């Protein structure tokens, strides 16, 4: 709309938002939403239920942002890897695991690609760098209480994002390493729901496996069938600092359930320390 109406004030607002979003694209074209309140309906290549980012970023590229065209190129390459028999699968390993695709992903993203193809061509003169290509140490996004780390071949996301979705237990909050990625290995792990539930069944992949385990590193106590974890704690203190070439996070948290209740024995305090360097990450706790 901003482009069609030549509303440059609105375009500037959208531009700043899209530039910030681009900070969260991984070097292989994946979108990092490991920290988000609605990450339960996202997958490695982006939003499972949305059309995608390509139309808007293509207009940005045409204006003055060639790096947006590079982002589209890398993401298309990822979509291609997840497409089999003309259908886009909801995860990079679904096809190999025998998990059926949902047609929603295919028609949603086909629509986004069509919106790009009907626009005037933009010449791509050279491959542009994306923000997470650079080794910059650490960036803090205060509004979402989330840090992006880039050291050597490692990329990581650390979050204490304490905004709850309308359904509790959907995303990590209490000082969590929500994503770890390596240039050669790709994703080592990414955060999952704190407790797996089909809270929006039409927008989520059904699961038929007998055993499920959360994919977010955490401290957890199960008592009388109730999980108490630092991932659900809204009263977490996080300190980030640089020391001797390490980016360190000191986290003081509590084991609570999704309703912020402590176990029977009372308040359980924990301290977890993370140290990031070019060699990797180490985690210790008390």
Where are these regions (language model features)?
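Extended polysaccharide-engagement surfaces of secreted carbohydrate-active enzymes
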Residues: 9, 24-286
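Eukaryote-skewed repeat-based solenoidal scaffolds used as protein-protein interaction platforms
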Residues: 1-5, 13-18
């Amino acid at each position: 709309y901003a482009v069609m109406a030549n509303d440059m004030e609105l375009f500037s607002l959208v531009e700043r938002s899209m530039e910030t979003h681009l900070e969260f694209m991984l070097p292989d074209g994946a979108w990092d939403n490991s920290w988000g309140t609605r990450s339960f309906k996202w997958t490695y290549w982006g939003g499972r239920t949305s059309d995608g980012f390509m139309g808007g970023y293509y207009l940005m590229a045409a204006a003055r942002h060639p790096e947006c065209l590079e982002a589209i190129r890398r993401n298309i390459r990822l979509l291609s890897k997840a497409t089999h028999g003309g259908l886009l699968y909801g995860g990079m390993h679904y096809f190999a695991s025998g998990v059926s695709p949902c047609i929603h992903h295919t028609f949603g993203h086909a629509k986004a690609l069509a919106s790009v193809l009907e626009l005037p061509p933009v010449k791509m003169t050279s491959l542009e760098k994306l923000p997470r290509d650079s080794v910059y140490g650490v960036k803090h996004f205060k509004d979402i209480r989330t840090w992006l780390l880039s050291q050597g071949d490692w990329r990581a996301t650390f979050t204490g994002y304490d905004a709850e979705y309308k359904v509790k237990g959907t995303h990590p909050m209490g000082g969590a390493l929500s994503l770890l990625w390596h240039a050669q290995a790709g994703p080592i792990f990414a955060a999952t729901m704190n407790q797996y539930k089909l809270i929006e069944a039409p927008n989520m992949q059904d699961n038929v496996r007998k055993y499920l385990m959360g994919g977010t590193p955490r401290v957890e106590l199960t008592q009388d069938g109730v999980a108490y974890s630092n991932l659900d704690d809204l009263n977490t203190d996080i300190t980030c600092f640089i020391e001797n070439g390490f980016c360190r996070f000191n986290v003081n948290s509590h084991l609570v359930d999704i309703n912020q209740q402590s176990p029977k024995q009372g308040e359980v305090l924990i301290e977890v320390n993370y140290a990031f360097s070019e060699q990797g990450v180490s985690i210790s706790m008390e």
